[in-house]
């Protein structure tokens, strides 16, 4: 392998991509495909049938915005291929035939999803070698630990993966399909109760921005709620693209609260703190202490202010009183999956782990289950 690997952190919301060995992704773009709602009539203005990534976001007012990945699972393979092709040719400007590729995936994904990824990479892009890594494991690499439990929450999936001395504990891996995109939908609902309506795919992108700019996690939800009704110190204004100003108040912490109380969305699931706790309880009694003291947060949905101290507080309530609990939230955590991939694929000991083109030709797509864990 003469050329360095290309690392693609295949998120449901944003695709992070770059060259192995670098310390941050070279390009981060929305994992979206935009298709025009109406027919183009002005000749020569160079309209296209579809736009990818930032180009789609820039023209979102006239496009239908679609995400090919939902809850970490690819729902439209043709669109997914366009996103990868955009990553290789437009963002990184590399020829995929010359570089091994490391892709990331959420744990407990259907096996067929992984096989199809492998097939497209080898057959459409003709890459020399391939590997699929679990997102949370890479985040642990990036944090420089070999033991810990990773609480990763992105746009499509929230999952907890306990790892001890470098071994993953697959029986204790848990996943909830509640993450950033669900929070955006919930925020749109909360804003609707205030009298602001956001319905189209482009308007939901505005809601996502409101969520990212203004939301925070309350340390004590009930107290914050009582506080919000009595004074208006929480009020913040947000200017929409057309110049109107909307005001948000209690919505700022009601939105991310759904991570801890999925019943707000009418979903029967455990919140993220309980999922992490259950994950720890599924592991062997001897290693729980190490996991409690190394709870590593990663992913874009863990970027809310106040989330680390809230997770700490919630887990302290659940765990035995004498247990020391430490939540680690690195500042670069929205890219830590990519950073971990960059570290992993540039290790000399990793080079024998790649699935090579020859192996793929001999065994077909199922080879990926044998070599990638």
UniProtKB/Swiss-Prot annotation:
Enzyme Commission number, as recorded: 3.6.4.-
Catalytic activity: ATP + H2O = ADP + phosphate + H(+)
Cellular location(s): Cytoplasm, Cytoskeleton
InterPro entries found in the cross-reference section: Actin, Actin/actin-like_CS, Actin_CS, ATPase_NBD
Single Gene Ontology MF annotation: hydrolase activity
Disulphide bridges, residue numbers: none
UniProt KW keywords: ATP-binding, Cytoplasm, Cytoskeleton, Hydrolase, Nucleotide-binding
Gene3D superfamilies associated with the record: 3.30.420.40, Actin, Chain A, domain 4
Gene Ontology cellular component annotations, sorted alphabetically: cytoplasm; cytoskeleton
UniProt enzyme class: hydrolase
Protein name: Actin
Name of encoding gene: AC
